[in-house]
Amino acid sequence: IDLEHWHAFDFISHEYEDVIVNLHVFHASVSASQLSGIKKPWSWYAREQLSSLNFPKANQSMLQKLQWPQRIKIAEDLATLQQLDPDQMLYWRVAITPERVMQLQQLPIELLSKLIINQELWSQLNELQQQTIRTLHLKQSQLVALQAGQLLRGYRYIAACHDLATLQQAEQIGCEAALLSPVLATPTHPGTETLGWEQFQQLATQVQIPVFALGGLKTEDLSYAQGRHAYGIAGISNI
């Protein structure tokens, strides 16, 4: 098939006992008409189905990047990391200061893989921390300033979006997921115009990356959100 929208996603080098395997991983957008032209032996699987398939060891890091949790907790307290459920990650939404960098340096390395931080904060970390924190957040202002090919290969990006233009921008430059908000009213942003579920669904169905619903949600809303084309939900409280 003739792919028009694609980008390099990762490069993986894995050493077996008798051979070194180099994998070049790409993301591509495939239209419905193109999908109908893809026949056996090719098969398509949802992300959540991949863990049940038998892949070689070389593919494991790629599979980990493709697997997103269904709930993203947003907090300023790093202690929240130790309270996460298996299907959660923490987006540490804080002002970028030297004190915040020092806080990260005091965390056990094994906890960092569950953490999402803004790209600007990530850029101030040491090499080991940068290699461990593989999920980076983009504010909308950062998102619109970037072009395809400028994201770091081997890292996955999740972008803050509020409309179709920014969702499409996130997809086009190679973001792996998006936070679309505000879906419902929130105490932290009273009076802000909300999308509502109907508009959220209309927007989310127009891109091929996972879209997380953000704004006024709680854990009990997950199933309903997924019925509205959300991959998962995110929020400050009750998530």
Q: Could you tell me what each predicted segment is?
A:
Residues 94, 136-147, 177-191, 217-239:
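Glycine-rich phosphate-binding active-site loops on the catalytic face of alpha/beta enzymes
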Residues 72-80, 86-168, 179-181:
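Catalytic beta/alpha-barrel core
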Residues 57-71, 222-229, 233-235:
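Charged phosphate-binding loop/patch that engages nucleotide di/tri-phosphates or the phosphate backbone
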Residues 59-60, 167, 200:
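A general structural signal for well-ordered alpha-helical segments in protein cores
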Residues 25-27, 34-67:
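NUDIX/MutT-family hydrolases
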Residues 3-6, 11-36, 43:
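Active-site-adjacent beta-strand/loop module that shapes the phosphate/pyrophosphate-binding cleft
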Residues 77, 161, 194-199, 203, ...:
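Glycine-rich adenosine-cofactor-binding loop
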Residues 85-87, 131, 173, 206, ...:
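Structural motif
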